[in-house]
Amino acid sequence: MLYSKLIKKTFYNYFFACIILLFYFSEAVSKYYLYYHSHKLNLPKNIKIVIIFLLFFYLIYQKKTKIMIKLLLLLSLFIVGQLSLNYDLLNVEKITIIAKYLFPIFFLNSAYLIFKKGKKQPFFKVFEYVIIFNSILLIIGFLFNVKLFKTYTHRFGFNGLFITSATSTYFYIIAIFYLFMKNKKSYYFYFLSAITLVSSVIVGTKSIFLFLMLLILFISFYKINKKHRIKAMIFAVVIISILAALFFIFEPSYLNFIKERGLLTAILSYRDELFLKETLPFINNNWSIINYFSGGINNVLNRSQLGLIDLFLTLGLVGSIVYLYFFYKSLVKGKINKEFMFFIVSLIIIISLGGNFFFSSTIVIYLVVIQQIFIKNNDSVNG
């Protein structure tokens, strides 16, 4: 009996702390093999499959049928859309697509249930250690031009051991907001904040620069006393100008790119062209009225890599609204304050301009940080 209680306590306290390490280091190993052996390992995928089964059986054991009903509803909408197309329904690629979209809702709800019975601190602490470890590698990569740690092969950017630019982008956006909400006065916190901000700039993605600019504006408007708001706004303009200058210093060819391809294509990194050449023709040639409500996709090549448009392509208008509602309720538990409203709005803006947020099964583990810091913040306000 005592042994059983100890196992349960360990599970609730450390399960998600272990998952962060497994997700991070499995992708790190995969990036190493991809770079040095031109071979992508299935290790990250296999780990995620095992975790899905563990969490699935946990939900069944806890008799949490509401989560399953939500997933089945979204799956049903997807199937309706697919049946309206003249393509095979039971296609491995299509199953993978909908599975990736369902995973965040499944994972966030599972995390919420487990953390209700466990401690958050080990999870937060491991997250901070990953920030420090990856940031040190990232800065070393920047200083010594270590190609393994690069974000892109063709332009500036270093992301440490993250395998994709999307994962590193959202990881550092979440890390910045996590530290903004934590806001402790200690040498460790100052070090963690400094190394996170420096690393965020070195990652070199437009989404991180955009988030930093939005955060600076938010602080200037809502966190600074009215008497000092004008000074704060001037300071914000200066900082934003510095960030913009840094971006163009690191990417000197970007201005030429804007002149050649246009501002929209530069901001969206060719995603507007993908939409016009792949997504829109597919919709025009294959969709019926039903598909506008429940979506319909043939393969990943139809995607524009614009988050909200790809969601609409997969689940249609009704499916997208239902999905976003379920996603929001999975992430935000309780009364939302202006800080978290800022994060949600910023996230929507960034997702609208970029891709792979909903489609990445790795980003969701770091979203659990946002979910739990939100709950912790609510508990401190109410308690």
What are these regions (language model features)?
Residues 1-257, 302-383:
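Hydrophobic transmembrane helix bundles of membrane-integrated enzymes that assemble
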Residues 34, 148, 254-315:
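Long extracytoplasmic/lumenal interhelical loops at the membrane interface
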